[in-house]
Design a protein with these regions (language model features):
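A positional/architectural concept
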Residues: 34-38
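Conserved N-terminal beta-strand and adjoining loop/helix that marks the start
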Residues: 1-24, 43-44
Length: 170
């Protein structure tokens, strides 16, 4: 995707801390995905020098841990329901981390944080398209794709593929 096209999209991060066979998730309280389980992340701030900085800052803000070894495992373009005008078109950079400092603590954005066994995730507690990429990322695959939602959050179109074309996936 060219830089001119990327400029028309909101950039965001999503991080999944992993400990052994479990992933840290929490219930999102605001914006896209409110009421559903998810990892931790958000949009860049002017002080962030890279998308890795955004990932580290947002994970610290939302769950209180400082990730040490984040790996970029995915890049997905989302076309969200029209009610989210500012967040309608997004490029989400998806990370995993297996090392961090601190203990998870809840925030006003993320509640009910808990460790979930990766092989037992109940995807009825996630946004509909999450089942298309989260299991692959948590199993170590790197993915790129596009997901388009209808206004009722049903999946309109999707295309997810394994890639080696990300910084941490060569």
């Amino acid at each position: 995707m060219s830089n001119a096209i990327k400029d028309k999209y909101t950039q965001a991060t999503l991080c999944f801390p992993i400990k052994g066979d479990a992933v840290l998730l929490a219930e999102k309280q605001k914006k896209i995905g409110a009421g559903y389980l998810n990892g931790f992340g958000g949009k860049p701030e002017p002080t962030d020098k890279s998308i890795y900085d955004t990932n580290a800052r947002e994970t610290k803000e939302e769950i209180g841990i400082s990730v040490k070894n984040a790996r970029k495992m995915g890049e997905i373009v989302f076309h969200n329901p029209s009610e989210y005008s500012e967040l309608r078109n997004m490029i989400v950079h998806i990370f995993t981390a297996s090392e961090w400092d601190g203990e998870p603590i809840e925030s006003d954005e993320m509640k009910k944080a808990a460790w979930y066994k990766i092989t037992d995730l109940d995807f009825s507690q996630f946004l509909p398209a999450d089942i298309l990429f989260i299991p692959r990322i948590l199993s170590g695959e790197c993915v790129k794709g596009v997901i388009e939602y209808n206004d009722d959050w049903s999946i309109k179109t999707s295309s997810i593929s394994v890639t080696s074309g990300l910084e941490d996936c060569s």
